[in-house]
Curated annotation (Swiss-Prot):
The lineage of its organism: Eukaryota, Metazoa, Chordata, Craniata, Vertebrata. GO terms for biological process: negative regulation of canonical Wnt signaling pathway; negative regulation of Wnt signaling pathway; Wnt signaling pathway. It comes from Xenopus laevis (African clawed frog). The active site is at 226 (charge relay system), 334 (charge relay system), 383 (charge relay system). This is Palmitoleoyl-protein carboxylesterase notum1'. Glycans are attached at residue 90. Carboxylesterase that acts as a key negative regulator of the Wnt signaling pathway by specifically mediating depalmitoleoylation of WNT proteins. Serine palmitoleoylation of WNT proteins is required for efficient binding to frizzled receptors. Functions in the prospective ectoderm and is required for neural induction. PANTHER family: NOTUM-RELATED, PALMITOLEOYL-PROTEIN CARBOXYLESTERASE NOTUM. It catalyses: [Wnt protein]-O-(9Z)-hexadecenoyl-L-serine + H2O = [Wnt protein]-L-serine + (9Z)-hexadecenoate + H(+). Its main location: secreted.
Amino acid sequence: MAGTLCVTLLLLLSTIAVGGRKTWRRRSQQIVPSSWERSEGGGESFPLDFTAVEGNMDNFMNQIKSLAQSLYPCSAQRLDDEMKLHSLHNKSVTCNDGSPAGYYLKESKGSRRWLVFLEGGWYCISRENCDIRYDTMRSLMSSRAWPPSKTASGILSTQPEENPHWWNANIVFIPYCSSDVWSGVSPKTEKSGYAFMGSLIIQEVVKELLGKGLDTAKLLLLAGSSAGGTGVLLNVDMVANLLEELGYPGIEVRGLSDSGWFLNNKQYWRTDCTDIITCAPTEAIQRGIRYWNSMVPERCKQQFKEGEEWNCFFGYKIYPTLRSPVFVVQWLFDEAQLTVDNVHLSRQPVQESQWLYIQNLGRELRNTLKDVGASFAPACLAHEVITRSHWTEIQVRGTSLPRALHCWDRSLQEPNKNSKVQLKGCPFHLMDSCPWPQCNPTCPSIRDHFTGQEMSVVQFLMHLGFDVQKMASQQGMEPGKLLGVLSS
């Protein structure tokens, strides 16, 4: 019965596709061949060229999505939701403690798209705080307790309703066990006590994947969150260069950096670096880059004096030097940025100087993203998003993050590649303009630190000591209208 249903659905899909092409011919008097028809080695799930049907795109995509979701159970027995752990063959490339580095892989036979994800998890910058990290967060420094398989969510999910454009790609998850923002190339020494080989781990994983199907890939998307997002910026061009050197120049490499775009701004409250969490970003990276023996891209390194390579860890400084296309996802009020700036929102009420600092942080971050061609920056108080199951719900100006990524993907395909203009109705440079945290109604929920209860935007602002009368006056609005806007 199930087999008959699947065959029927497949026939229906082909009927719609053929019927659609006939309709397109009548409307446009020409057919743009689909990438199915152009590709030589097999295609993706639904890699159609919709250029001729921009007017009916939403209806057609809804039909395709519905059919994809209906067909998904047909292949459920063949698709394994779990990613399997593989230890690196090259045992000299290790985690901090000398245990073998590795990666989790879910293969998707027939797909020529690969998503390689770099996990995040802060860093350590001295023997002392690395020892503490090893005692309290050992899985971020050692592979000895990694499970043999794992499942993932968000852009790593195999469910089309949760991951509409990447669910059928080959998915690779590289656990973070180098504590060096994916930048180190240093083996374990007696002085350091640990190995820092983040960049080398990425290189070894890519080399091994060539023997597992990456050699026939069309696209490799190097993605990462938090420290992994910064790792994307540091390594995306290296991966592209590596593949070219190994004889695979036809594999296009792109980057997706989530919550890894930090500012080296002045802290709200200055502290020394005894606590790694509240250490100023610039000082932390300056110390870390020496301890890790970090490698930064040569094009970025050349922009700064010797000894100032730490600048390349900050997105707005390295981005102009990158050759590979990169999409930047960044909360305007990132919790990790606020933490290193010593802004503690759990305390109430927030002083006016702190409130102004928070608003200014949003403005500064927005300014650093204005020249980034592909970006998604909601005015929310959060950290990381692309591996969250709710990642499809966040919107900026009515466009969701998966949709923005899809539009970016389309813009990089022929014949759109050389166009400087975004495709009509398909934006991928999206930033909120409202000036305070959680002013975007699609932001993830905030919870009270003490009660655990969800808070509305108004409750959250009141919790911070928000002066409704004063803020309404600043915005030129009546207090009641301001609260109405915040509540909607």
